[in-house]
Design a protein with these regions (language model features):
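Active-site-adjacent betaalpha module
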Residues: 2-9, 42-43, 55-177
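A short alpha/beta connector and helix-capping loop motif
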Residues: 5-8, 23-54
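Residue(s) in the substrate-gating loop at a strand-loop-helix junction
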Residues: 14
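Short acidic, Gly/Ser-rich segments with clustered Asp/Glu that frequently serve as metal-coordination loops
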Residues: 17-21
């Protein structure tokens, strides 16, 4: 699947203040998720987020807190298992791009629930993390085995742009420096 900005939604899963310090390479995960969110904002891609038990894990990290138009607080590990999830996704968004934590828990369970429901899912490998890198890698492998695309944030940006003549090309390109 080639990603396109018009049919995408960026879903930020559980990138929370008290969870991220425990995530391996959390600074990279947050930076790549922020790159995606800023590109999504520039290109008009809807941004949504989830927060797993915010009373315990805190709110979305400050680097990303201003981006989502809507945030769903949840307790189910799969975002799809929470009331209100279906309404969280904008109509017409047939490509769901996922960034977040933990890759082997909430990210993977959400992916595994979305795929059989006919959703086209891409997991952004450099924008997902787990406490243990081995868990992250196995989660990416398993998501791929079940039909998810595994992409990088830079792949997403260039596919969303589609062409160097895109009026937002220079602004998005600056995010890669």
């Amino acid at each position: 699947m080639v990603l396109n900005a018009e049919g995408s939604v960026l879903l930020l899963i559980d990138l929370q203040q008290r969870l991220m310090p425990a995530i391996h390479d959390s600074e990279v995960v947050i930076a790549r998720a922020a790159r995606l969110a800023e590109a999504a904002r520039l290109l008009g891609v809807p941004i949504r987020a989830t927060q797993q038990y915010p009373a315990g894990l805190g709110a979305t990290v400050p680097e990303l807190a201003g981006y989502p138009a809507e945030t769903l607080d949840k307790t189910s590990f799969s975002a799809t298992g929470n009331p209100g999830f279906a309404a969280l996704l904008p109509p017409g968004a047939d490509q769901i791009l996922i960034a977040g934590a933990e890759a082997h828990v909430c990210v993977l369970q959400t992916v595994l629930a979305l795929l059989p429901a006919g959703r086209r899912v891409a997991v952004v490998a450099d924008a997902v993390g787990s406490r243990d890198p081995a868990d992250r890698q196995v989660a990416l492998d398993r998501a791929r085995q079940h039909g998810a695309e595994i992409v990088t944030s830079e792949m997403v940006l260039f596919e969303w742009l589609g062409d160097a003549r895109n009026p937002k090309f220079r602004e998005v390109q600056k995010l890669l420096r």
